[in-house]
Amino acid sequence: MSIKLENISYVYSPGTAYEHHALKNVSLEIPQGQFVGIIGHTGSGKSTLIQHLNGLMKATSGKLLYEGQNIYEDGYDMKKLRTQVGLVFQYPEYQLCEVDVLSDVCFGPQNQGLSKEECEKQAREALKLVGFPEKYYKQSPFELSGGQKRRVAIAGILAMHPKVLVLDEPTAGLDPKGRDEILDQVKLLHEKTGMTVILVSHSMEDVAKYVERLIVMNDGEKMLDGTPEEVFRHYKELEAVGLAAPQVTYVMHDLKEKGFDVSADATTVEEAADEIYNFLKKRQEVQS
């Protein structure tokens, strides 16, 4: 099972003075079970792109295939698609609406026509998946911290049992602790369930640590696509379009240029520390 885009283009306000080409012939395939990051500066097209994945926006031209079927064909079941491809918008906590946490997470399954017992079962499973404490299930969602609200909102999507989870800037507005907790939980969720996770972010540091594949959007086009290590090798090209690679990328490239025998492909502080430690250890062994 996969999501496949074939030459997807999208134009806002076509034929008017406000015409804007938000997506330009974007082609890519996301296999089932992959953890993908989509990154780009404001206006790059990344948010427009993900809203095509569950049919919230319809491409001006091109095809979008989910599980081999073109979602733009007449009679395609869009309702089913939107339950299988769950989209969590920026600041999803603004959509919380029920009197307590458990009721809020039950909202999606209820709209799928499930019984009260089934709704509650799936809601509890979803809250457990995002690491939300059971003692708060009957608390008003509006009394929670920002990070807790974000978890509840994500659980509300998971309760509908999607096969694909799309997260648009899931850490926006959170402090560093809340940001790390959410991303750690998303990574754990991916490892536990094997579901496809698509993470949209503007932070290279975030995506470098968590995703296995990185897609860079620029001016409505797919600019780069590969592993984080492959993408960050193009750090000068990223700089040219207003994006910065993780700080460790610059440090490791500087060390390599100065003659240190280290890999410049480290994408996290931990990887860089290991690389430097191994280099120093080898040098010490040679000197002794």
Question: What is each model feature region?
Answer:
Residues 54:
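Helix-to-loop junction immediately C-terminal to a conserved catalytic motif
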Residues 118-135:
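Conserved ABC ATPase "signature" region
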Residues 140-144, 148:
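Conserved ABC ATPase signature
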Residues 161:
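Conserved catalytic motifs of ABC-family nucleotide-binding domains
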Residues 165-168:
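Catalytic Walker B motif of ABC-type/P-loop ATPase nucleotide-binding domains
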